[in-house]
Amino acid sequence: MTSYIGDLKPGDKLMFKGPIPKFPYKSNQFEEIGMIAGGTGITPMWQLIDHIASDKNDKTKVTLLYSNKTEEDILLREKFDELKKDPRFNIVYFLDKAPKNWQGETGFISKEAVDKYLPKAEAGEKAHIFVCGPPPQVKSIAGPKVAGQQGEIGGVLKELGFKSEQVFK
């Protein structure tokens, strides 16, 4: 997408669509939400996080596992760091190339990290997991997403016992 936009010339037309709501969230719909995002996959997560944060009556606990290559790549960092002050939110950063003084997690988001930080599959309807990121990450965590469809549950989340109805990718 970025290279396409970069190749545009003055006067070229660019069509946008959206926003297109894909998950109709209701306040307090879940007790806990787990989110796994990679890179620009943070965009839909931010929309839901911002919605929950702006509703003080929404008691949903949200944990975000957010992976990037470098610390400079973390989008919305100031907003997420501010949200850490709200007890409803837990934000955990993962970096592939972490600086020496890095306090967050390193490497890819693993099965162990998902199990450590996110709600458990046994929570059933009380918890929900959202996944958005590069296709290899989504496939590894939740199984492949089919164009316009969720696709079957797979990857780490299936190994941890999650069912399709508990996951949105």
Predicted regions and their residues:
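FAD-binding FR-type
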Residues: M1-M35, L48-H51, D96-K97, G154-K169
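Hydrophobic structural packing positions in well-ordered secondary structure
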Residues: G11-L14, M45, F80, F130
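Short, flexible active-site-adjacent loop segments at beta-strand->alpha-helix junctions, enriched
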Residues: I20, G39, P135
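A generic secondary-structure signal
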Residues: K22, L48-D55, E82, K116-K120
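Conserved S-adenosyl-L-methionine
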Residues: F30, I52-V62
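Active-site-adjacent beta-strand anchor residues
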Residues: M35-G38, V131-C132
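Hydrophobic/small residue at the entry helix of a nucleotide-binding pocket
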Residues: T40-M45, Q137
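Reductase modules of NAD(P)H-dependent flavoproteins
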Residues: T63-K169
